[in-house]
Regions:
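Acidic, metal-coordinating helix/loop segments flanking the phosphotransfer/catalytic sites
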Residues: 31-48
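Conserved acidic carboxylate
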Residues: 7
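Alpha4 helix (beta4-alpha4-beta5 surface) of REC/receiver domains from two-component response regulators
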Residues: 80-100
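Conserved phosphotransfer microenvironments
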Residues: 46-71, 81-84
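The C-terminal output helix
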Residues: 114-122
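Two-component/phosphorelay signaling modules centered on CheY-like receiver
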Residues: 10-30
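C-terminal output helix
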Residues: 86, 104-114
Length: 122
């Protein structure tokens, strides 16, 4: 199962990617929200789209809605230093999983995998 990470800097996700692989997941990267086309999301549906920290606030909501419109079965999360409640308020109603901290460690990846288990995605 694949996690699609939308980030301008894939290199900063190395440890996180190792944690995903240890949890039986793989990851791929897109450089920007515009790289996510509805057709490609439908043809090669990722388990989760993970938005990196540059995509926040209204831009994150808009990008998240775009993914939902392509395929509402795709889970989403974002990498941010916001507290859980603040993050939840910004993406309320979009079904985002808990945010990933900026540390992007293997442990953070395992926590995300556990969240996917809780929503029965794995």
């Amino acid at each position: 199962m694949q996690i699609l990470i939308v980030t301008p800097e894939a290199a900063r996700w190395t440890a996180f990617g190792e944690g995903l692989r240890a949890a039986g997941l793989s990851c791929s990267f897109a450089g920007a929200p515009d790289d996510l086309k509805a057709e490609s999301l439908k043809a090669d549906r990722p388990l989760l789209v993970l938005w990196d920290e540059p995509y926040t606030g209204d831009a994150l909501r808009a990008a998240g809605i775009g993914v939902i419109m392509a395929d509402a079965r795709i889970n989403q999360s974002a990498c941010t230093d916001e507290g859980h409640e603040t993050f939840h308020e910004k993406v309320e109603g979009l079904g985002f999983l808990p945010n990933v901290p900026l540390t992007r460690t293997a442990e953070d990846a395992r926590a995300l995998a556990n969240s996917l288990v809780k929503v029965s995605a794995l």
